[in-house]
Amino acid sequence: GCRDLRDLRLQLAQASGVGSRFLDPAGLPEQSAFHRQILGDIEATLRQHLSGFNQASFVDAVSLLGKARMIHAFGMGGPSSLCSDELQVRLVRLGYPIAASHDPVMMRVTAATLGPEQVLIVCSLTGLTPELLDVVKLARSYDAPIIAITLADSPLAELADVLLPLQPAETSFIYKPTAARYGMLLAIDLLATELALALPDDNQERLRRIKLALDDYRGGPDSLPLGD
């Protein structure tokens, strides 16, 4: 409750300051223009993230993953869940044992079984989700190495052994999906490529076998992507 009229005004002012871009969003662009605006935001996000990534962090991540007996990818919410699945798709093609999980109970069960020989990769656009932070702390208590793809300076980033940092990418145009998820996808693509190039001959053979298995199964032109 409010103590008096002054307190009421103060609380109303504080409430209006939270999510103000949703109370007074930017004007609607012309329909022919917002397509270009979305593309422009994606391009800007990719350039921003590429310039913010550190090659040494990817080298450290490759070193951890190369020694892992098992890799687990955790993510909650929309883009973060999808990106943890994307990690599984990318890494399994290279022969890495990996499983993705989004359910908070299953993540907790998994975290309790981890140790120094397993690696946990955690995807989060915010680095703030309480359930995700809890399971990462649990995994750390058993000395499991943590790779985080998340906002720099977030609580999740502070828990990571290796950080692949994301950067804020929100605009005042609230009606489109966040462009930040493209930064996470870029991090995953860079990591997967670094892993592939770490053992190029072995991975060439794995990819050849996948291509052969898919061509026998579905056919199609040689230029089709692997694994779709």
Language-model segment annotations:
Residues C2, R36, G40-E43, G52-Q55, ...:
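Electropositive phosphate-/nucleotide-binding environments in soluble metabolic enzymes
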Residues L12, Q31-F34, E158-L163, L214-Y217:
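Hydrophobic/basic alpha-helical segments enriched in Actinobacteria
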Residues L197-D228:
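Internal, active-site/partner-interface "lid" segment
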Residues G1-S57:
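HTH-adjacent hinge/linker in prokaryotic transcriptional regulators
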